[in-house]
């Protein structure tokens, strides 16, 4: 085995090279990355190498051989697959690693994200739903020093930025959201999809699932006339049709 | 194998420790417990031990090693996984075991439950649908002494309680529904999800599936203008658009 | 192996005892027979024995051991599982075998069937859709003597009967539809589901899939304002919103 | 093994005979080819033989033995399965091979295609969505000489032709779209489904997935009042209900 291939071959299903492939397949069946859309990057917590899904590959058929591996210090590719180009998302993934201390980033073309970007203005908002408690608040518990989640009574706010012709052109707006929304773990790109990150791939996956659930729910609420961030007990007066 | 691990290791796919994992995976793919939401508890009919899914775990990846086991008499944990905390639902599960003689409890973040909780007031109601016959009526057949199901002409009523910041705060309202709805096998928590129980895990699973089917159908009926509990033959006069 | 068990044990995946289980599992994941709803019966073309799914079983977990086997001549059970009762649908299945020369019958609680039964009156109608060509017309090709399918320009009509408290009470209305719709291969039961039959289980499965596809499409058309049986080119004038 | 069977037996999962079966099964579970609808044809890049799915087969159960193989020069069948007839789509597939230099053609009964054909006139249009970038523009990069994809700011246009009683009657309209839309990789057939082709089966699959995603999105946009080809920033003024 070449020294490059050692980087991607492991019997451990939780090795980044294996996990990216498993999750891309799972996300494909969620309609999140059909037609080669979307992607995942994971930082190996042992080596600090970045593992990156390539551009243009069918996400449900991806294998570890298809992955790029990058050194986090030099930003040089330690391994490049012969058949593929690096994903155009790579600069965005690097920004999340460098500015948000991310351990993994998930990018999908979720239709829920695209629809929310058409309905909402500059910010997706939903409040008072149990699933919000899966999302980090950005605050730290003063006693345990652990990161605190949003509470049921909080409003989840996710910034929405405009899409550009090429993904690397999103970088300025991405950096701006890092400043304007220092606690967000996600950015919606209008008419495009969503980027979600977390300190580990497990966390990023949980955040992404919870946010997609909340976007799906927000669309259903909107279609029934209920503002997704309306107060508890206010739903009925917004309903387009009388409560049964 | 330690004495604690004996509790969770079995070759029998119907052993509670295995069944909780199998069903959590199945429910994950139903969008009922993504983002670590939801949970299941089963009472082992042989030992009367309670098996409980932990807090914060990805439900489709759960293994028997992740489970808590509790003694039904002392309410002490016979086994605690190192990595996880007990679910905040535990007091609610215990209430169902103790007050409703449950053999298993299923908790999901089903979007159908959340949407029904936004549209309905204090009670979910649906009538005159065949699937209602899967739900117990609370009555006992005077001849066979077996529990009787609802009939096609009955109205299924499920109480809806308000959500709180923490799940253990739901306990008072849960006890109140036990009094006000002595025959119910489920409680919807507004903007949160649903709890469903039964004398066995098989029954609880069937009740949960049937109720979710009925909530999904009720939402579709509501969206077309038909009150889900309207009389047979009354549908057409409620339709928003003329019958084709 | 007992003589009764010989009836249900076969290595052939197309043996009726195996095929009923495979299809029930597949239909469960289509949301057609959750909560123990629905069922399948197949006539073994070699023995003329009827294989019948039992009442109350979780359809995705069913095994050949759970099946009833009935002699087509004597209508006596050649095999009865210890744990289950015969399905209440059995008299309806027998009527399809005896009056329609069916080789298999599929019964589902498809929500598309229930919704169509709420929107349509006594007859489901859809016209001018390619998938209609999967449904038999009841006519025979004068040259090849083979059964002919509906054409693209035909209107598929499926009778809708009222539900009763118990499934065996549907028998009179079922017989009436056999007379009024001599060419139909399906009957919708209002607020309940659908029965579909065919000369073989393969045909019954294809008819059921095509009809469910057409009911799903009809609901979408209805929701956009288009009568599902409207003429080709008439769609646009029915649209609730202007064509984009 | 007979010389005919050599054509369809291979251990390579990417051999056309294996790939057609794998993809038909995958597409069946997408609701794209239930009830025997739809089909796939692949040209073997090594032999130039056409592999064709037969008529009337259950697409999720298809095996290599069910396939037709045709010589691209003589258009004679090198292999015909005993049980099946050639698909009525065969002349349409041949037209795509001969006039569009296709390497593979996918035909589905996608409900998204049928609904779009009911809502749109002679052309499906969607603009300014990231997923559009998966579709070829028909232009060639002047430097790299590689085919260029549509850009985010482009409008994807897919012609819609009228359905006929028999699929071979579509041939004239198909040829007309080849002239009127020289760059299209797909044709929607009203009230029927869609044909999508590409230089390889991998490309055809990616195009088909991306187009289905875009048709699904267009229907959702239309239902909310947003013209799928409206300008960026114009969405809000089209919304049926106010932005939340």
From Swiss-Prot, chains A, B, C, D:
<keyword id="KW-0456">Lyase</keyword>
<protein>
    <recommendedName>
        <fullName>Methylthioribulose-1-phosphate dehydratase</fullName>
        <ecNumber>4.2.1.109</ecNumber>
    </recommendedName>
</protein>
<feature type="binding site">
    <location>
        <position position="107"/>
    </location>
    <ligand>
        <name>Zn(2+)</name>
    </ligand>
</feature>
<comment type="similarity">
    <text>Belongs to the aldolase class II family. MtnB subfamily.</text>
</comment>
<keyword id="KW-0963">Cytoplasm</keyword>
<comment type="pathway">
    <text>Amino-acid biosynthesis; L-methionine biosynthesis via salvage pathway; L-methionine from S-methyl-5-thio-alpha-D-ribose 1-phosphate: step 2/6.</text>
</comment>
<dbReference type="InterPro" id="IPR027514">
    <property type="entry name" value="Salvage_MtnB_euk"/>
</dbReference>
<keyword id="KW-0028">Amino-acid biosynthesis</keyword>
<dbReference type="InterPro" id="IPR001303">
    <property type="entry name" value="Aldolase_II/adducin_N"/>
</dbReference>
<feature type="binding site">
    <location>
        <position position="192"/>
    </location>
    <ligand>
        <name>Zn(2+)</name>
    </ligand>
</feature>
<feature type="active site" description="Proton donor/acceptor">
    <location>
        <position position="130"/>
    </location>
</feature>
<keyword id="KW-0479">Metal-binding</keyword>
<dbReference type="GO" id="GO:0046570">
    <property type="term" value="F:methylthioribulose 1-phosphate dehydratase activity"/>
</dbReference>
<feature type="binding site">
    <location>
        <position position="109"/>
    </location>
    <ligand>
        <name>Zn(2+)</name>
    </ligand>
</feature>
<dbReference type="GO" id="GO:0008270">
    <property type="term" value="F:zinc ion binding"/>
</dbReference>
<comment type="function">
    <text>Catalyzes the dehydration of methylthioribulose-1-phosphate (MTRu-1-P) into 2,3-diketo-5-methylthiopentyl-1-phosphate (DK-MTP-1-P).</text>
</comment>
<feature type="binding site">
    <location>
        <position position="89"/>
    </location>
    <ligand>
        <name>substrate</name>
    </ligand>
</feature>
<dbReference type="GO" id="GO:0019509">
    <property type="term" value="P:L-methionine salvage from methylthioadenosine"/>
</dbReference>
<keyword id="KW-0862">Zinc</keyword>
<dbReference type="InterPro" id="IPR036409">
    <property type="entry name" value="Aldolase_II/adducin_N_sf"/>
</dbReference>
<dbReference type="InterPro" id="IPR017714">
    <property type="entry name" value="MethylthioRu-1-P_deHdtase_MtnB"/>
</dbReference>
<dbReference type="Pfam" id="PF00596">
    <property type="entry name" value="Aldolase_II"/>
</dbReference>
<dbReference type="GO" id="GO:0005737">
    <property type="term" value="C:cytoplasm"/>
</dbReference>
<keyword id="KW-0486">Methionine biosynthesis</keyword>
